[in-house]
Amino acid sequence: MVLKMEIKWYVKRGFEDNLIDALNTYGSACVLGLAGMGKTTIARYIYTKLRREGVKVVYLTSDEESKTIKF
């Protein structure tokens, strides 16, 4: 399944390339932070960027209510 995520605008923070390098090196990455800090936006940006480059990407997210992981 390919998620349809559109990023209308995104302000790069300077570490996105490091995150992509980590994904290329280790095959996965975990984005942690406080609520409202932009974790989901960063993940969507990276997902969209890599998909456009032809990379196969799996986007995992946690459903807070049921505590399950969807992929």
Swiss-Prot record:
Pfam family, one: nSTAND3
InterPro entries, per the entry: nSTAND3, P-loop_NTPase
Domain of life: Archaea
Protein name per Swiss-Prot or TrEMBL: Uncharacterized protein MJ1241
Organism of this sequence: Methanocaldococcus jannaschii (strain ATCC 43067 / DSM 2661 / JAL-1 / JCM 10045 / NBRC 100440) (Methanococcus jannaschii)
